[in-house]
């Protein structure tokens, strides 16, 4: 009897570490997405005309906050990073507090809300980036990535990080929902995994 | 003892009906969003130039599949409608099958995946519609809703239905996650709510 409980404690300790690892990965993915997109800016000078033989130059800047979908992207990734940071702190330092049904339930619902948010932001930005890359001939919207290549490359990097965050958050959300069915007590890493009597 | 179990059966019967009602609402919201956007098309003729005094006319058509975000919107709303239809059928006709932990867990995870999908599609389409309505002066993308007002109105209607679907799916997902903590047996409406012994 004691042996099976020992194995339960061992596996639940291991699954908590995996969940903690996933949260750390998700935190770094969404935080880097928010930072890379938030700092994404490129300034370029183009020749826009000629007066006689003298070319007329104009300077243009591409910045993330020129596109509402990218502003939403930065805000949402920052919020989800904060959520994961909170959950990580809860798991590491919240060891003494009992992981009761209600606590697990709120973590599961919060995770679901955050995966909904990050998936909305990543997809809105992705479809907007697609228009920036390919344009839309029906709406006569020209592509911009032929003139602002660095800006688009950085944007693509932020999108990849954000979609990695979406996948990680889907796994984390499914895991925290599953924990409700077998509520193994996610012991904190500081407290030694107590053998369940 | 029997009285408290009777009240449990009564409340669980009621909560199942509410969940069923929410699913029916979500189903109609996402289905109408998919249909309205899928059929969204407007053809107009504009004067695009003059040769001498004779105006040159050209006919333009705005269709949902001219925009990848709207194609994603129609597909995602159709998928979430199908998911809800399946869950409704399961709840109505699946009465005899025991709602065990695993069944409730898979319903909760499926609901989470579907709210993630519908939120991605609704937000991607919303930000694209915003560009259609207001244009983007930085990218020099002109708005199109001044010329295709009906097309944009129908698109707005589909978006409102889809966001209603997102809110309903958030509530449904939270409810199906909460059911894992108090797994009241969601009895089917056909079988009379059996009194839990």
Swiss-Prot record, chains A, B:
Keywords assigned: Acetylation, Cell membrane, Membrane, Transmembrane, Transmembrane helix
Quaternary state and interactors: Homodimer and heterodimers.
Protein name per UniProt: CASP-like protein 1B1
Protein family per UniProt: Belongs to the Casparian strip membrane proteins (CASP) family.
Parts of the chain on the Extracellular side: 39-69, 128-156
Source species taxonomy: Eukaryota, Viridiplantae, Streptophyta, Embryophyta, Tracheophyta
PANTHER family: CASP-LIKE PROTEIN 1U1
One CC-aspect GO term: plasma membrane
Residue spans, topological domain Cytoplasmic: 2-17, 91-106, 178-197
Membrane listed as a keyword: yes
């Amino acid at each position: 009897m004691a042996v099976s409980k020992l194995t339960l404690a061992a596996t639940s300790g291991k699954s908590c570490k995996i969940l903690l690892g996933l949260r750390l990965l998700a935190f770094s993915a969404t935080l880097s997405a928010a930072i890379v997109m938030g700092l994404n800016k490129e300034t370029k000078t183009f020749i826009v005309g000629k007066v006689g033989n003298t070319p007329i130059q104009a300077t243009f800047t591409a910045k993330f906050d020129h596109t509402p979908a990218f502003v939403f992207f930065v805000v949402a990734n920052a919020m989800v990073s904060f959520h994961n940071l909170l959950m990580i702190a809860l798991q590491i330092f919240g060891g003494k507090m009992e992981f009761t049904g209600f606590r697990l339930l709120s973590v599961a619902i919060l995770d679901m809300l955050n995966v909904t948010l990050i998936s909305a932001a990543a997809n809105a930005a992705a479809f907007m980036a697609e228009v920036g890359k390919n344009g839309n001939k029906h709406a006569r919207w020209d592509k911009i990535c032929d003139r602002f290549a660095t800006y688009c490359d950085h944007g693509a990097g932020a999108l990849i990080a954000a979609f990695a965050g979406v996948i990680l958050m889907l796994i984390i959300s499914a895991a925290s929902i599953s924990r409700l069915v077998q509520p193994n007590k996610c012991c904190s890493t500081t407290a030694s995994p107590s053998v369940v009597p």
